Amino acid sequence: MGFYMLLTVALLLTSLMNVEATPVDQAERSALEKSGLGNRIQPRYDNCGDAEADCYQSKCMDEETYDEECEASCNYVVANCISD
């Protein structure tokens, strides 16, 4: 039993030593938004034109190719660009 514990710890330490961190400047860091259970990269939009262009592209109109980028742009459009 002790052998397996030692083996597990050794494997964990080995895997942690192989992880390389890449530096991220503040501009890139602020472009990432925390969403849901983890971090997803979501573009931030400064105006409705860019968000609408992304939301209304053909890949976002197809249920099979709709992805997180489509969701982020369409959520921005709904929240900020559509007036009643």
Swiss-Prot record:
The keyword Disulfide bond applies. Keywords: Disulfide bond, Neurotoxin, Secreted, Signal, Toxin. GO terms for cellular component: extracellular region. The keyword Protein biosynthesis does not apply. One of its GO terms (molecular function) is toxin activity. The cysteine framework is IX (C-C-C-C-C-C). This is Turripeptide IX-03. It comes from Gemmula speciosa.
